[in-house]
Amino acid sequence: MKRINALTIAGTDPSGGAGIQADLKTFSALGAYGCSVITALVAQNTRGVQSVYRIEPDFVAAQLDSVFSDVRIDTTKIGMLAETDIVEAVAERLQRYQIQNVVLDTVMLAKSGDPLLSPSAVATLRSRLLPQVSLITPNLPEAAALLDAPHARTEQEMLEQGRSLLAMGCGAVLMKGGHLDDEQSPDWLFTREGEQRFTAPRIMTKNTHGTGCTLSAALAALRPRHTNWADTVQEAKSWLSSALAQADTLEVGHGIGPVHHFHAWW
């Protein structure tokens, strides 16, 4: 079986629970070789974001050229893009190199509530990047921001917003329902072929730092092994549930700790 080369395009987390660091751990845990392009240096920890240093868009583009001109990339995950010019740089390079299997984690807020994407960049992400990606993974606040609509409060509203996002041109949408007041924490997958509901019991832990990054990276790493998104989502969610179930064993930081990416090994 061909080895999978996976790329993450995202910001950093020096505490290791989110961003590039979480993505590379996820790739390794799921048997993919990880490459990375850094969009922002983020001073953050389990308590929140202290500072963000955005990488110059030209240097983001140069990193992408370095990877795409040399390494066969089978799958890509995009996370924090920070600002409009970086969104433009990434969109242009994806188009230039005809990159396939792209998962976009529509990162706008950190778990702590700190902003990670400027408001002006949302419109550019919507118009330039969404039509090029295979899957987007918004939570309910992110979906509302993309649609410039109120936050979905019911599962029916969540369904309506997922369909609206799919109509914006991306290949598929995984709407994450963790913000709903529902014990099952339903997620909905929207594709051109249909819709599917996924549920999993809520795992009682405060240590959920980087779950969005980790899920989107898992979806990217696993997609080349499956023929459809439904099977990919099922495996990724199952793996993440195990990582969450073991999160409390890590004892990292004094705030919202990370999930255990390597729960299968130690």
Curated annotation (Swiss-Prot):
4-amino-5-hydroxymethyl-2-methylpyrimidine binds at Q44. It comes from the Bacteria. It catalyses: 4-amino-5-hydroxymethyl-2-methylpyrimidine + ATP = 4-amino-2-methyl-5-(phosphooxymethyl)pyrimidine + ADP + H(+); 4-amino-2-methyl-5-(phosphooxymethyl)pyrimidine + ATP = 4-amino-2-methyl-5-(diphosphooxymethyl)pyrimidine + ADP. Its EC number is 2.7.1.49, 2.7.4.7. Keywords: ATP-binding, Kinase, Nucleotide-binding, Thiamine biosynthesis, Transferase. It is an enzyme of class 2 (transferase). The keyword ATP-binding applies. Pathway: Cofactor biosynthesis; thiamine diphosphate biosynthesis; 4-amino-2-methyl-5-diphosphomethylpyrimidine from 5-amino-1-(5-phospho-D-ribosyl)imidazole: step 2/3; Cofactor biosynthesis; thiamine diphosphate biosynthesis; 4-amino-2-methyl-5-diphosphomethylpyrimidine from 5-amino-1-(5-phospho-D-ribosyl)imidazole: step 3/3. Pfam families: Phos_pyr_kin. GO terms for molecular function: ATP binding; hydroxymethylpyrimidine kinase activity; phosphomethylpyrimidine kinase activity. One of its GO terms (biological process) is thiamine diphosphate biosynthetic process. InterPro entries: HMP/HMP-P_kinase_dom, PM/HMP-P_kinase-1, Ribokinase-like. One of its GO terms (cellular component) is cytosol. Belongs to the ThiD family. Catalyzes the phosphorylation of hydroxymethylpyrimidine phosphate (HMP-P) to HMP-PP, and of HMP to HMP-P. Shows no activity with pyridoxal, pyridoxamine or pyridoxine. Monomer. This is Hydroxymethylpyrimidine/phosphomethylpyrimidine kinase. It comes from Escherichia coli (strain K12).
